[in-house]
Amino acid sequence: MKIGSGFLSGGGGPSSSGGSGSGGSSGSASGGSGGGRRAEMEPTFPQSMVMFNHRLPPVTSFTRPAGTAAPPPQCVLSSSTSAAPAAEPPPPPAPDMTFKKEPAASAAAFPSQRTSWGFLQSLVSIKQEKPADPEEQPSHHHHHHHHYGGLFAGAEERSPGLGGGEGGSHGVIQDLSLLHQHAQQQPAQHHRDVLLSSGSRTDEHGNQEPKQDANVKKAKRPKPESQGIKAKRKPSASSKPLVGEGEGAVLSPSQKPHICDHCSAAFRSSYHLRRHVLIHTGERPFQCSQCSMGFIQKYLLQRHEKIHSREKPFGCDQCSMKFIQKYHMERHKRTHSGEKPYKCDTCQQYFSRTDRLLKHRRTCGEAIAKGAASAEPGSSNHNSMGNLAVLSQGNTSSSRRKSKSKSIAIENKEHKTGKTNESQMSNNINMQSYSVEMPTVSTSGSIIGTGIDELQKRVPKLIFKKGSRKNADKSYLNFVSPLPDVVGQKSLSGKPGGSLGIVSNNSVETISLLQSTSGKQGPISSNYDDAMQFSKKRRYLPTASSNSAFSINVGHMVSQQSVIQSAGVSVLDNEAPLSLIDSSALNAEIKSCHDKSGIPDEVLQSILDQYSGKSETQKEDPFNLTEPRVDLHTSGEHSELVQEENLSPGTQTPSNDKTSMLQEYSKYLQQAFEKSTNAGFTLGHGFQFVSLSSPLHNHTLFPEKQIYTTSPLECGFGQSVTSVLPSSLPKPPFGMLFGSQPGLYLSALDATHQQLTPSQELDDLIDSQKNLETSSAFQSSSQKLTSQKEQQKNLESSTSFQIPSQELASQIDPQKDIEPRTTYQIENFAQAFGSQFKSGSRVPMTFITNSNGEVDHRVRTSVSDFSGYTNMMSDVSEPCSTRVKTPTSQSYR
């Protein structure tokens, strides 16, 4: 018997190559040569029906009934068998073969399927019964042999469609070349059929088959004992063996013929499959007696029980750590040795743990291969697997089965990832997971297939796109410039199909930095490390959804838009963009979330570090203390502070970055004041406050006996929540000015100060407030300040901070010609840094100058007005719990 070449070349359909004898429809052209006329394969017969149960050796003889007669019961092929020309008598069919068609699937429904799923479905729909006549076994033995050895053992004659001619000496090479061609044209399941049927040929002049082949096959037949044992074992409902028993004996022991219906995992035996199915069914036969946990295997339960018994038999010989499992100990030892035995084949990275390698592979190698395969569904994956099956001459069936199971598993994973949209991007931003539904397969597929390496090399770590908010989405597409625009548009739509792994999946950690100047977004930083630090610190900062002018977009997803917007610093001079700083996020946090108790220390410290390089060369010009109040112009559109009323045009103006800082803080102060429902601290008459760029690195703790001098009064603010990190800030970024009229000035001279943590300040503040709770008017005595001074002396040796009095002039320029009648209210800082102040309670704060040059501060308030953070003015000289002793007795009124 012989299978016609139409099955090979046509792939179960019409003849692909045409010509005489090349397709299933050309049997009459080649059938006039004698009694050995070939029975040709029915063109509509489904390719994947060449499957065998383990009770029967494989059969490769599928014949067409003669004339218009009904199919004989020995070969019932349902509707797929049609009448052949009457002039073509078929060879005698296998009398022992009966195909039972299950009603679940129709054989005619599968011919066009080209995926491995069709392979499985058609496999489910066919059952074969055991042969009744043992006399037919030798011929089947020979056919069976050709399934495995026909390619390489001696294929006699190839049909003209195979291009083989009459000579059998070219058979192996011709078959291999043919299979290479078909590997590029047909899906994976064809390779199995091609390989199975390619060698089973009889010569043109008869049906006699070489006896040595039959002898070889008999030598390869399994022992009847093993066959009987396996025949007794009932296959699981989930088990659909891919091979027969006879084939299984020939194949290598590493084969996994048992496939799980749930996840397409392959197993060597039905026991392993049944044990695996428990994972899907949720059954846990082994229950722990001490907790509610259950396990599918006994050894897992025994290992778990060691947790309850606290038994850790495996200890590290280099440290004191012990482990329940030996594997955990060995894995731990690699942390001492630095060994990284696990290598990613795609990017050549090494890993010390398999779980890290697997996590990396999800974003690296297999994802890229999967993307390339899905770009060209018919050729890429199956082509590689087909060539693999052909070239592995040692165990072709094993390689075929492995490749099939891999293709099933990979395809299943593709479906899952397509549904859940879960993919991650590694730090080096590898391209990943091109969609199954990629539009314009021919163009985009070729681009993806050929240029992935180049694409990876060209992909930048960060893309900065200038433009308005509506263009923010398009900036993400710059990651995939080699791809056509259709890909980008589809991925922007957020569909699970047309997704680039970078664009349309939830957990992408791309950070797109978009800074807006006057409402427009532009680049703010090219420093990737700063961006990552900011993304770590954003856990402190809830999302500020509405910020008018400045935003830093930390995008997790285009569709998700997990954006942290913050009042960024406007870069007025476009020479060098500012690095990404946390002050912008801090401003947005203060502005949008007034109910937060304070700002994290890390955020404040990063602000201080950002503006630590200010000039100290500018001169002092005090403001008059007794002048009436003039509001500061804080329009968001101004690029500088308005100077016509409160700035001196004759003095040196601050640099652009300082001006932009002043502008931002002034704008924030004004907005906070307008939104404030809590009356904060109103400074006394003539007290002027200049907008803070950022809180001081520490409390401005003034050294003893030098607090009051005749220099202009400059008092830098120290915030109650200050950074615990050491800072080398040479001076306070902003200060507070007092007028020159009383002749009493406060000067911050150079001193060494130890920074105090916010918790220490808060504790001291609460303690002092509790002590003062019984009296509405209280006085912070000099005795307390003395004790605080002693503490300060002990702390003076740690960190040095210089607080020059020239700082003020670097922030604002007072007028020399006319004395501005300006005061600044600081209610907004009460709102910004401590929204816990009760609404409606105004805490007036005034500085009263005594005749002897002392400043008397009193605060008439109760502790109920405070909720944990002192007012900003308490840091002008010292807070209620200040750690500096001043030579005068001061209290707050």
Swiss-Prot record:
The modification Phosphothreonine is found at T886. Signal peptide: none annotated. It is found in: Nucleus. It comes from the Eukaryota. PROSITE patterns: ZINC_FINGER_C2H2_1, ZINC_FINGER_C2H2_2. SUPFAM superfamilies: beta-beta-alpha zinc fingers. Residues 377-396, 645-658, 775-813 have a biased composition (Polar residues). A zinc finger (C2H2-type) spans 258-280, 286-308, 314-336, 342-364. One of its GO terms (molecular function) is zinc ion binding. Residues 1-113, 126-148, 153-172, 198-251, 371-425, 613-658, 775-815 are annotated as: Disordered. The modification Phosphoserine is found at S392, S481, S648, S782, S805. Residues 127-139, 201-216, 616-641 have a biased composition (Basic and acidic residues). The keyword ATP-binding does not apply. The keyword Amino-acid biosynthesis does not apply. Transcription repressor that plays a role in regulation of embryonic stem cells (ESCs) differentiation. Required for ESCs differentiation and acts by mediating autorepression of NANOG in ESCs: binds to the NANOG promoter and promotes association of NANOG protein to its own promoter and recruits the NuRD complex, which deacetylates histones. Not required for establishement and maintenance of ESCs. Represses the transcription of a number of genes including GAST, ODC1 and VIM. Binds to the G-rich box in the enhancer region of these genes. Belongs to the krueppel C2H2-type zinc-finger protein family. This is Zinc finger protein 281. The lineage of its organism: Eukaryota, Metazoa, Chordata, Craniata, Vertebrata. The gene is Znf281.
